[in-house]
């Protein structure tokens, strides 16, 4: 869903902090250091006063799991009720060539721009936009569900006759982003699921 990172982000952050607290509590028993003097950095338990590595997380996990005296699974879980919402904004620019006698529209160029907050995974965000643009090109140029007027039964109810657009129908798909971090989000994110598919077809039309 579009809001998954926005909604789940709060639970992920909250649960991560709980897990960190449990890890440091366990590390305090092993290292005889005060919890408030330790932190986690680069996969290690470090002393905050001088940055000294006290032990690695893998060493801590091995000790917790295989300690014969008191084996322990260090886990955390929590529940978070989301009470906010964030709105994404985007637009599409399309250049088309129209052959009026042949009633044919050819898409020459298209660009999709989105303000979806901070990009957690830029490569995946670009791929998501490309997928939405492909859907929009199909909506605008080739997809139409046809029905038999007498029976009401669909005439092109398979992927051979229902003409989805493919990469052979596309020009270069350009995706750009405006990263305005969302203050109500755990990681500054907004939505980027459905929005890329919304404005493409109207732009082509």
Task: List the model feature ranges, each with a label.
Residues 1-205:
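C-terminal catalytic domains of large/alpha subunits in multi-subunit enzymes
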């Amino acid at each position: 869903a579009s809001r998954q990172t926005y909604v789940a982000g709060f639970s992920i952050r909250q649960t991560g902090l709980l897990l960190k607290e449990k890890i440091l509590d366990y590390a305090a028993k092993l290292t005889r250091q005060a919890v408030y003097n330790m932190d986690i950095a680069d996969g290690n338990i470090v002393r905050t006063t001088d940055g000294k590595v006290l032990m690695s997380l893998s060493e801590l996990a091995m000790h917790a799991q295989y300690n014969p005296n008191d084996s322990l699974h260090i886990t955390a879980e929590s529940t978070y009720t989301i009470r906010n919402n964030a709105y994404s904004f985007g637009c599409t620019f399309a250049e088309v060539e129209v052959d009026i006698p042949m009633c044919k529209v050819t898409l020459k160029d298209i660009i999709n721009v989105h303000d979806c907050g901070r990009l957690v995974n830029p490569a995946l965000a670009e791929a998501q936009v490309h997928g939405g643009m492909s859907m929009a090109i199909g909506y605008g140029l080739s997809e139409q569900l046809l029905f038999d007027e007498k029976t009401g039964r669909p005439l092109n109810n398979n992927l051979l006759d229902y003409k989805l657009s493919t990469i052979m129908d596309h020009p270069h798909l350009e995706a750009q982003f405006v990263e305005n971090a969302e203050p109500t989000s755990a990681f500054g994110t907004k939505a980027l699921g459905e929005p890329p598919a919304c404005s493409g077809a109207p732009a082509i039309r």
